Amino acid sequence: MRHKLLFSFFIFLIVALPIRSKDFVLTSGQTVVIACSPSEEQVVRTALEMLGRDIQTVLSSTTQTNEKTGEIVIGTVGQSELISRTGIDVSALKGKKQAFLLSVSPEGKLIVAGSDKHGTAYGILEISRLLGVSPWEWWADVTPEKKKLFKLSSKFQSLQAPSVEYRGIFINDEDWGLMPWSSRTYEPSKVKGEIGSRTNERIFELLLRLRANTYWPAMHECTLPFFLTKGNREAAKKY
């Protein structure tokens, strides 16, 4: 009888003790597995590539994409089963444009849910910001600090949505600045007045990191129009 009572007591302790939620932790040198559906839009895949580079820069870690599970789980609400499987409440994203939710699950996974494709992309690059990567890392030579460990509390949650619908950059007075730098230095071209696709892609990358969605390209008479420049249309589609 005494043994039965002790056994029952231990069972009670096991049942009564709460399950402790885990922090989200990445360590230097590990392979970071990211769960993301291959059906996600191109801008989401572009943001994933950028995050992969940022993780390599900050943690000296490689990334690997998996369709089912990972330390980071990414998806667009209503389009990705990965998000619905996590069981996290994404109702706060309903009716919002280009919004995202970052949340650490009880298992210690970082969940990134977007209300639409750009919301998901912005959420992915919020991880880069949390890692310490500035949106201006390339244009202003802001080298991020190396880390051995990156951790988010088990209670971490961040819901963000834009307060202004259209946010972007207008390229002005390119005659003496961007255009000659692009055509003579960054991507030398024999085409007069050309701001090449590599230059524009760097601008698009900055826009995505800044969560901008509008681009007014250079329009002075000395500059070749945006859509007449080879590769610009294809570059824009990635972002």
Question: For each of these PLM feature ranges, what is it?
Answer:
Residues M1, L17-I19:
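Short, low-complexity interaction segments enriched in Ser/Thr/Pro/Gly
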Residues M1-F7:
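Bacterial N-terminal signal peptides that target proteins for export
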Residues S8, S105-G108, N200-R202:
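Short hydrophobic "helix-edge" motifs at membrane interfaces and signal-peptide entry regions
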Residues T31, S37-E40, L59, N66-T69, ...:
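Aromatic-lined carbohydrate-binding surfaces of glycoside hydrolases
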Residues F7-A16:
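Bacterial N-terminal signal peptides
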Residues S21-A161:
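Contiguous, structured surface segment used for ligand recognition
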